[in-house]
Regions:
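Conserved tyrosine-mediated DNA breakage-rejoining catalytic core shared by Y-recombinases
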Residues: 57-118
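Long, amphipathic, Lys/Arg-enriched alpha-helical "connector/arm" segment
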Residues: 10, 14-37, 47-50, 58, ...
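Catalytic-site neighborhood detector that most strongly recognizes the C-terminal catalytic loop/helix
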Residues: 18, 76, 113, 183-208
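DNA/chromatin major-groove-contacting recognition/catalytic segments
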Residues: 30, 82-87, 193, 197-214
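Single conserved hydrophobic/aromatic residue that forms the stacking wall/gate
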Residues: 1-8, 13
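Short, basic (Lys/Arg/His-rich) helix/loop patches that form interaction surfaces
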Residues: 25, 29-38, 48, 106, ...
Length: 214
């Protein structure tokens, strides 16, 4: 079962950057009721901050059940096909992440480990499908839109899951350096400026801590 206590407090959504607490809970409930291996990617992004391209490129060999960690060392994207003789204008490529910092190992929450154990298959199979066939990011984004619609949540970009993870993590008192490394960022400054969206409630809670000095 996915722990709702990890949802955190209500957040102020700026340009639909993150899910609200209510939306967060609705999405988790929907995934619990309808879970299949395709939806594991949503959990990896929402609870571990994994990018959509990284999610789509994952294979079961990237999951270490002994150390309960996930290895991120590749990403999938659709790019322009420069071959003039090619039938299609674009093609799917799987390559190393955009920066050295993006290559990382992330501890997997125990409830996700337990879900993974139920679907574990051959190491060369893709995580999202359990087969040799992958799901590309554009298709997975469309699948995510369907999940939102079926759970009654207003449309939001998949990348918002990563922003939601970062913001909830700060609210749960993650130290910023650990969070930055989990996200695969080049600097702590970038994490704070681009990925953390504190609510008025959270800011007030922090300000009230100053009362101890009165």
């Amino acid at each position: 079962e996915i722990p709702l206590r990890l949802v955190g407090s209500e957040m102020c959504i700026r340009d639909r950057a993150i899910l609200s607490k209510y939306e967060h809970s609705k999405l988790i409930n929907y995934i619990q009721l309808t879970f299949d291996i395709n939806k594991i990617g949503v959990l990896l992004s929402l609870f571990m901050g994994v990018r959509i391209g990284e999610v789509c490129a994952l294979k079961w060999e990237d999951v270490n059940f002994q150390t309960e960690t996930l290895r991120i060392n590749k990403t999938m994207q659709r790019i322009k096909n420069l071959d003039e003789k090619a039938v299609t204008k674009t093609k799917i490529v799987i390559d190393t992440p955009k920066s050295q910092k993006s290559i990382r190992e992330i501890p997997i929450p125990s409830f996700i480990v337990n879900l993974m154990k139920k679907y574990k298959t051959d190491k060369e199979k893709y995580l999202l499908t359990g087969t040799a066939e992958f799901i590309e990011p554009r298709v997975y984004q469309d699948m995510f839109k369907t999940y939102l619609k079926e759970s009654g949540i207003e449309d939001i970009n998949y990348h918002a899951l990563r922003h939601t993870f970062a913001t909830r993590a700060i609210e749960q008192d993650f130290d910023i350096k650990s969070l930055s490394e989990i996200l695969g960022h080049s600097s702590v400054k970038f994490t704070l400026e681009r990925y953390v969206h504190p609510s008025e409630e959270h800011k007030r809670k922090n300000m009230e801590k100053m009362s101890v000095f009165y």
